[in-house]
Amino acid sequence: MSLNKDLTIIFVSFYSKNIIEKPINQIDKEIPIIVVENSLDKDLKDKLEEKYSNVKVLIPEKNTGNGGGINVGLKEVKSKFVLYLDVDVELNKSTIETLYNNAEKLDNFSILGPSIKNFPYKNEFYLDKNIIPGVHSMNFITGCALFFNMKALNSIGFFDEKIFLYYEENDIYLRSLKKDFKILLIEAAEINHLGNSSTDLIQRDDIEINRNWHLMWSTFYFHNKHFGIIKAYEKTIFKFLSSFIKFIFFSVVQNHLKRKIYYARMSGIFNAMIGKDSWFRSSIKNNIDN
């Protein structure tokens, strides 16, 4: 088996044209890369495909979120394995090879995850430590770097595109475990997740409002989908009441950002409760990186 033939890398980009080349340059030029550009920036497609012979940029018809963006890439691949990476992930020299080598020898897994520098996992995320030395069975791994076994993933199903943001990984992990596929943490494969934002303060405010809306919507949707309506209300009703109180308080003291954030949280929960789709979107325009 050949790593270059058996593996495809996927990035999902959203207004990342200032930083996308850095993660691409970490990848061996023989490994095919798919970039899904959720900002619908066709100029970026032309630029990257002209510069990198191993890069294909896909422009979806609309922004369906991170999980939906990954799905766009997954539907294009023909390889045995896929490595999804956030654009702000730094790889060690051996990270990809270590994940691939483990994938070739491990059985019955759906997803492998690397260890993350300065990010120890809580004990509650481990199902079985050291099933072989340095390999742990998990119920959750951070979604910034996911190594997919495509045969298993085709059995489980791809990401739930009703979820725009938050809980998309939890959903696919739970579906994976229900089908008895393992999620494995590979200690020897290490990454650094920078978690940096490339947007300015105003844009970060807009993104923060967007994130809060979707966190609340997805919390209700995920728990309703997998555990029923009562559990969904248990998880969100006090968050709704708390957000209402804070919305009133920050309206009185005229903290406009906090007021918008807590209104967004209430709106996200309310829309999920009444069965509306995850419709809220950031208002960032195409020229924010100019």
Question: Could you describe each region identified by the protein language model?
Answer:
Residues 131-148:
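A recurrent flexible, glycine/aromatic-enriched loop bordering the glycosyltransferase active site
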Residues 93-124:
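Conserved donor NDP-sugar-binding/catalytic core segment of glycosyltransferases
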Residues 210-218, 229-290:
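Non-catalytic, C-terminal membrane-associated alpha-helical segments of glycosyltransferases
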Residues 60-77:
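Glycine-rich, basic loop-to-helix element that forms the pyrophosphate-binding segment
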Residues 82:
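Short aromatic/hydrophobic "clamp" motif used to bind/position activated sugar donors
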Residues 145-148, 152-157, 162-190:
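A short, conserved alpha-helix in the catalytic core of glycosyltransferases
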Residues 11-29:
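Short, well-formed alpha-helical segments that are part of the catalytic scaffolds
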Residues 26, 37-46:
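A conserved acidic beta->alpha catalytic loop
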